[in-house]
């Protein structure tokens, strides 16, 4: 698994975890956030490794579908770029910096 995919899944999980079942949340959290192996998760839940794999793959697909429709992660990335551009334009002006900070905290 690539670092890029892991990072993307972590963001998608952050944005959409409230739409997942408790089992999906648990498997994804253990796999992506806590770096558990499929075997470790299977042992923890007394299921087969294949069952964990299937659940994670289905959940990944669901997260991608949510993103395709809601675009929360894409919009987050775009806002981040805008904040960075604004910071360059402020040229260290404290008032402008604090306004940008306030906007970022709203995210």
From Swiss-Prot:
- Disulfide-bond pairs as recorded: none
Q: Name one Pfam family in it.
A: UPF0122
Q: What does this protein's UniProt record list under function?
A: Might take part in the signal recognition particle (SRP) pathway. This is inferred from the conservation of its genetic proximity to ftsY/ffh. May be a regulatory protein.
**Family indicated by similarity:** Belongs to the UPF0122 family.
Q: What is the name attached to this protein's record? A: UPF0122 protein BLi01817/BL02321
């Amino acid at each position: 698994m690539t670092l890029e995919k892991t990072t993307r899944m972590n963001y998608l999980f952050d944005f959409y975890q409230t739409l997942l079942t408790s089992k999906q949340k648990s498997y994804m959290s253990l796999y992506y956030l806590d770096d558990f192996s499929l075997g470790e998760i299977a042992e923890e839940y007394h299921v087969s490794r294949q069952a964990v794999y299937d659940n994670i793959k289905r959940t990944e697909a669901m997260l991608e579908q949510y993103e395709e429709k809601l675009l929360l992660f894409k919009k987050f990335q775009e806002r981040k770029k805008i904040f960075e551009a604004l910071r360059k334009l402020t040229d260290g002006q404290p008032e402008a910096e604090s306004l940008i900070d306030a906007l970022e905290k709203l995210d």
